[in-house]
């Protein structure tokens, strides 16, 4: 069952679900997917990712990347941005890291509206649409104009598969303003023995 999202992201999710209904899952006859049997992924019972997990800071510490103590660390749990486990170590005049919902409702609303899901315009397929439809409140990163951000931004994507197969759809929108530089490293981690 589809979960209705309030606010500006609701229309984005609704359009993506309509696109998925029209496009369906890609099959081997689609060039980009000819070596993948995507339908096999959906034979298991799926759990849509939620924040309600037992993942703690102690769990996170096991997966931290090198020099994490000086980097900005942004955490997704089951596809949902988790500010409580995230640490922004850059100054606000250099880097903004907020929820996608906050960006869509604030100073970056126009940018979010113009760019969120833009890749579907030139790469329409069912998996892309499904990802967008179930992308819960994601992450927005903005590197401010002219700023050279020397320390990296680490994004940790944790899937807690202990309760079962997790269908998590992390979504990050990055805005690098003119003459700014930014380094981002992402890590994908599954906790538990089930697939995610």
Task: List each language-model region with its residue ranges.
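Glycine-rich and polybasic anion-binding loops at the starts of cofactor/ligand-binding domains
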Residues: 1-196
């Amino acid at each position: 069952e589809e979960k209705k999202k309030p606010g500006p992201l609701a229309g984005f999710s609704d359009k993506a679900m309509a696109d998925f209904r029209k496009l369906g899952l890609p099959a081997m006859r689609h060039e980009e997917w000819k070596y993948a049997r995507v339908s096999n992924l959906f034979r298991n019972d799926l759990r849509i990712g939620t924040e309600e997990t037992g993942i703690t800071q102690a769990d996170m510490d096991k997966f931290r990347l090198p020099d994490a103590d000086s980097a900005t660390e942004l955490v997704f749990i089951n596809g949902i941005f988790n500010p409580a486990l995230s640490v922004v170590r850059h100054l606000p005049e250099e880097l903004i890291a907020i929820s996608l919902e906050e960006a869509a409702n604030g100073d970056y609303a126009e940018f979010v509206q113009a760019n969120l899901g833009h890749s579907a315009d030139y790469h329409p397929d069912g998996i892309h649409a499904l990802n967008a439809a179930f992308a819960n409140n994601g992450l927005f990163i903005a590197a401010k104009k002219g700023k050279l951000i020397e320390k990296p931004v680490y994004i940790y994507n944790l899937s807690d598969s202990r309760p079962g197969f997790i269908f998590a759809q992390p979504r990050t929108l990055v805005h690098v303003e003119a003459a700014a530089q930014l380094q981002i490293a992402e890590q994908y981690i599954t906790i538990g023995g089930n697939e995610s």
